[in-house]
Amino acid sequence: MVMAYFVENFWGEKNSGFDVLYHNMKHGQISTKELADFVRERATIEEAYSRSMTKLAKSASNYSQLGTFAPVWDVFKTSTEKLANCHLDLVRKLQELIKEVQKYGEEQVKSHKKTKEEVAGTLEAVQTIQSTTQALQKSKENYNAKCVEQERLKKEGATQREIEKAAVKSKKATDTYKLYVEKYALAKADFEQKMTETAQKFQDIEETHLIHIKEVIGSLSNAIKEIHLQIGQVHEEFINNMANTTVESLIQKFAESKGTGKERPGLIEFEECDTASAVEGIKPRKRKTFALPGIIKKEKDAESVECPDADSLNIPDVDEEGYSIKPETNQNDTKENHFYSSSDSDSEDEEPKKYRIEIKPMHPNNSHHTMASLDELRVSIGNITLSPAISRHSPVQMNRNLSNEELTKSKPSAPPNERGTSDLLAWDPLFGPSLDSSSSSSLTSSSSARPTTPLSVGTIVPPPRPASRPKLTSGKLSGINEIPRPFSPPVTSNTSPPPAAPLARAESSSSISSSASLSAANTPTVGVSRGPSPVSLGNQDTLPVAVALTESVNAYFKGADPTKCIVKITGDMTMSFPSGIIKVFTSNPTPAVLCFRVKNISRLEQILPNAQLVFSDPSQCDSNTKDFWMNMQAVTVYLKKLSEQNPAASYYNVDVLKYQVSSNGIQSTPLNLATYWKCSASTTDLRVDYKYNPEAMVAPSVLSNIQVVVPVDGGVMNMQSLPPAIWNAEQMKAFWKLSSISEKSENGGSGSLRAKFDLSEGPSKPTTLAVQFLSEGSTLSGVDFELVGTGYRLSLIKKRFATGRYLADC
């Protein structure tokens, strides 16, 4: 029991103790708010650190996998990921603590309002005694003055009338003084009683407040302590793993994985030449003038073993590149009897009259040549499209017998390694289907002519699939993360990239070319495209622009408790300009201002426009829309800079704005998750429940390309799963792949992934699983876009959302 400090120490001459205690109670609300801000700042720091650690773990997985040191990176990666998860877990606990403090603050405000009403009587008593004290002091001073005046008149021998008059005033002052003394006594008694009760009430409130605040601080310190214990365990595990990763084990693993065989070269004995089997008239071999030393073509005639004198040789003529020139012989006889090929390596000289020398085309199995030909075919086909108003047509026929050599003459191909780098986000239906499989087969096999019109430089056509992002293989799903792009103008390399979509997330500029008919037939787009849009007409034409709305949903599920789900949804808007528009902007000193409106923003918490290029009016009062306009001078300068960096690009992308969507916990996740682990020394049972949540989307859409990855330790020897999964023993991860989930799926999009693992070094430790999916044609926020004013038209709008970090713990 705390002593009554407030009752004993807040009286005083001026009776101001009540005012001090009341304001002290109000200061408790300020301290509660400041404590919440402090915890929130700590959570922000921990979240930033967790993101940095996750990025570091991802970079560790991208380091060189060559050499004996390569397995050590897996140890670093695992340890760093666990550290990141520790700090992420602390973030979750701190966010829960913040909610608790905020709830307490709301209750505190209500309690203080109630207390204010209860102590209103004490406030009146304080005011009464203060006013009575002042009146008493004045009456006392008046009484003393009248008494002194009466005595002075008596001593000075004043008239009787003056003395009587002074006596009346003195008596009146005496009565007033006595009256206020009595009033003060009553006010004092009432004040002391009420002030004692109120002071004790204020002390009780402060005790309760401080106890609760100390509990919050205790929860904070315990959370930090637990995380530090986990971090210590992670470091201890890292030390043990490094101790177990011996030099011998690293060398042994490298030898087993990269070894070239255990068989040593055998003995070869000298064999005498069998001269009896030699044939007369054998032709000698002679090295050509352009031959490379050490490279000798095998003999086609096994009997050529003797070398007669050089005088008996017939040396054929060679051209400037070193190839043998075909002699003038009977062509018919040659076709009937002989057909040989010669490479650019060393070869023997044979009699010209018996051979026909030809250079065959490159073997079709050459993968690099094939990829390059397909790339150039894509570029060639991408520049052939149907014009909306066909005036002149030129028939183009693509024959079956076009050789790879003929196709490669059209345009230099992109590097083949860039052709395979397509991830889930790169399957962009807005920009046309992939030409890797369909174009090379269906288009090249067409024998009918198609009326086409070649595109000008500034023509807008639906672009091909983006090839700017690497494929997220199942082995790298554990590092799923989307890092927002800064608004600063991106740096474009000087080398010409392969044709890519104008709205690809990883590029600021790209070249767009594909078949408009294919895109219209196979691509579900949002909005209406007017097809190719030439921008070389004049300044009075409406100029085409394309827009992409891309959102990323990040979620963290903890067991089956929906209240512990953490969700963050962000989005960005990218605008794409055709290259021909730069000439229109530069030729016109005052181009039309591009104004646009973002609609359905009621679910957005924050909108961050690109401050360098975009303006907005902060005084707009409409809660569901917001208007913006672009700084056309800055846009022109920026587009010219992009054009100088990459003059071959057909389109240039501009980051317009970014935004954050308000979330309501698990109700805002399109795919709900819950994980259950049952771990024993010999087996581990895993179940992942998932449920399609249409309420998270404004318009329910299909989730496609779902991938689930679960790390499982404990020395997995065998895995049984339903539906079938893939076990990667090297990475110790199980992978599930589902094509799509929607309301029309079985059980309304609900289901389970089950697996049983047989262990040799159990038990396993429950880990965090990661999920990836995407959805085309809609957004989670329902945000929409429209142009305002004249001078521009919206040729294409694309909407999509995909996962960022989508994790689940047990």
From Swiss-Prot:
SMART domains: FCH. The modification Phosphoserine is found at residues 312, 387, 394, 403, 488, 493, 496, 508, 510-511, 533. The modification Phosphothreonine is found at residue 385. Residues 3-250 form the F-BAR domain. Residues 433-456, 502-521 have a biased composition (Low complexity). The keyword Cell inner membrane does not apply. Residues 521-810 are annotated as: Mediates interaction with DAB2, EPS15, EPS15R and ITSN1. There is a cross-link at residue 297 (Glycyl lysine isopeptide (Lys-Gly) (interchain with G-Cter in SUMO2)). Residues 87-156 form a coiled coil. PROSITE patterns: F_BAR, MHD. Belongs to the FCHO family. Homodimer; disulfide-linked. May form homotetramer. Interacts with AP2A1. Interacts with EPS15, EPS15R, ITSN1 and ITSN2; recruit those scaffolding proteins which in turn may interact with the adaptor protein complex AP-2 at the plasma membrane. Interacts with DAB2 (via DPF motifs); mediates LDL receptor/LDLR endocytosis. This is F-BAR domain only protein 2. The gene is FCHO2.
